[in-house]
Amino acid sequence: MLWGKEWLYMAQKKIIAFINAENEVPANVGCLALKYSYEGADGLFIYNYTGDEKSREEFLLSARKIEKQIDIPFFIGIYVNRFEDAKKALYTGASKLVIRKALLPEEDEIKEITARFGKDKLAIEIDMKADFHNAAQLDQYYNMGIGTVVLKHIDTTEAFREAVLGTKMHVLVRDGLIRNDLAELLSYESTEAVITNYFEDKDIYKAKRAVKRQGIDIPLFESLIDFSEFKLADNGLVPVIVQDYRTSEVLMMAYMNEESYNK
């Protein structure tokens, strides 16, 4: 599995689920992370920008536990004031650290972070409604050492298109998908992923299939064999062996119908 920059910067577009961990029970955050991991999310963005140290330490502990439970990469968003804060965040196993523009530390701290971990480990989140940035303004952060930008509260205007197509930064769009369309956001050549909480109670694979039908390449497990080609058991089902995907341990024999096979 690709967990670093190779995972994100592959040609395929991604759907990343975000989880707001502020004022949330850690066990609930962990359960939701596991649910997304099982149900088709390509990655997670888990954040808690609370400023007090006790809350940060509890969040970091929770993030380390989540990293051991899930099989998809995750980004971490946390309050960072100095290099040590960033180091603790990335040592949770997170593939990227996301810092809000309003909470950006001093430039010297950013340079120390990127000197140690690389430009690809650091992202800045910008509210495009409150503080629109064009390509040149985005590139200032790239030149500072930040490789990725997360753009939220966006409108799909010509100005937005020019900004994302013109910047040197890797572009991720964070959106609730209430006004904007998933396929449209992913159709921008420079948009590498959409970060959303829209699929907390919805079928991610169904959305991926719809996006793929529109010609957008996105990770999707698809069988090359049609259900009709299988020799069925007397009950009209396909016999299957169920294994633990981590250990390959055989758990049981089961039967699958066409609806389950096509999911």
Which residues does each PLM region occupy?
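Glycine-rich beta-to-alpha transition loops that act as phosphate-gripper elements at the mouths
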Residues: I19-E22, I72-E84, L103, I126-F132, ...
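Alpha-helix-loop-beta-strand connector modules within alpha/beta enzyme cores
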Residues: K54-G77, E109-M128, T156-I178
